[in-house]
């Protein structure tokens, strides 16, 4: 009879469900729980192996007939922004991002709610309550924090803090080899700012300042309008059957 250490992770497989990225496809996921004293180390290993974190769950696609979801990470030290990305940075130079503990707040949920209603009204997260949001943010056994973006104020250069309501927010995990953008959302009425792109560019710079080699972006899905933007941040590495492969 095979025995397993008490704290060894147990993996499970979900039932098939409609794919949110490719019409006509069905997705399955393999997942495990990130709890206890080894949660941080396990999250490191699994992230490097193509898993993503959601609260205390680490998951990876395990679809029977499709391999379109490919983990991507930006090579921070080699990244050079394109002309359009430099314009996005200039467009948002009136913003400042402040790291803060992963504690939920009512103004965060208000922004989250506006974002979902405007951008993902037919998505699986649209029914999330304030309690669901709180769990998404604070239910974690790994090193994580929020980066909250606000407009610069008269004292920002001194205290590093912005003023007014948050314009964008990212839940970010800190790993030994990089930052991982778990979930980000932004003010839909500020669409001209390209805030999704801006937060990625800002996190690349944050990783560089921390001396971390990678920024994990999650899954790139070729042909999916929801995910195709991730290919614009290069050079990057994509997780293939033979391991991480550099793509210019």
Curated annotation (Swiss-Prot):
Its EC number is 2.3.2.29. Keywords: Acyltransferase, Cytoplasm, Transferase. Disulfide bonds: none annotated. It catalyses: N-terminal L-glutamyl-[protein] + L-leucyl-tRNA(Leu) = N-terminal L-leucyl-L-glutamyl-[protein] + tRNA(Leu) + H(+); N-terminal L-aspartyl-[protein] + L-leucyl-tRNA(Leu) = N-terminal L-leucyl-L-aspartyl-[protein] + tRNA(Leu) + H(+). Its main location: cytoplasm. GO terms for cellular component: cytoplasm. GO terms for biological process: ubiquitin-dependent protein catabolic process via the N-end rule pathway. Belongs to the R-transferase family. Bpt subfamily. Functions in the N-end rule pathway of protein degradation where it conjugates Leu from its aminoacyl-tRNA to the N-termini of proteins containing an N-terminal aspartate or glutamate. This is Aspartate/glutamate leucyltransferase. It comes from Methylobacterium nodulans (strain LMG 21967 / CNCM I-2342 / ORS 2060). The gene is bpt.
